[in-house]
């Protein structure tokens, strides 16, 4: 099973990092999430510097991001939220391929040595200085306020009127 193999590669890569704590959250409803949860559960039971949470809730999640050293995985959160906290992301595999991301994101394959080397890079003073200058490609906070302001200025007419067309089915 590729999902199990990839999960084990990640866990093997971080196992040697005994001087750090690792927080895991349950994966989304993707295919194979049960395998990922099972493997992480086993790993957390054997490694007292690792913790697994089903869900942290938004406030706790953002607090963890703020006080973390970075993110490792293939979550869109690493591409979307982490740049706002000026933290690096190690994006593993192809799951987020094709998405826009900032220079605080380092893409790697599911390879133990590559992941370990990238963890070390993520923590270097040089990389940390570099990402302080980076802005998220997704813009700045406050988009919803701007959208509401623009919509209030626009005159929107006939939004409830639907136009139908007869289609010849013969």
Question: Can you annotate each of these PLM segments?
Answer:
Residues 1-170:
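Nucleotide-activated sugar donor-binding and catalytic core shared by glycosyltransferases
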């Amino acid at each position: 099973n590729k999902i199990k193999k990839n999960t084990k590669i990640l866990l093997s890569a971080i196992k040697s990092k005994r001087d750090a704590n690792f927080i895991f959250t349950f994966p989304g409803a993707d295919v194979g999430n049960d395998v990922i949860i099972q493997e992480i559960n086993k790993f957390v039971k054997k490694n007292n510097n690792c913790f697994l949470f089903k869900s942290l809730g938004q406030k706790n999640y953002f607090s963890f991001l703020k006080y973390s050293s970075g993110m490792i995985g293939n979550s869109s959160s690493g591409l979307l939220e982490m740049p706002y906290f000026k933290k690096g992301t190690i994006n593993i595999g192809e799951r987020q391929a094709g998405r826009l991301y900032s220079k605080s994101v380092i893409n790697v394959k599911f390879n133990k040595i590559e992941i370990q080397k990238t963890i070390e890079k993520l923590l270097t003073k040089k990389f940390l200085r570099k990402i302080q200058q980076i802005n998220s490609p997704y813009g700045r906070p406050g988009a919803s306020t701007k959208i509401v302001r623009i919509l209030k200025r626009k005159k929107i007419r006939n939004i409830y009127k639907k136009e139908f067309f007869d289609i010849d089915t013969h």
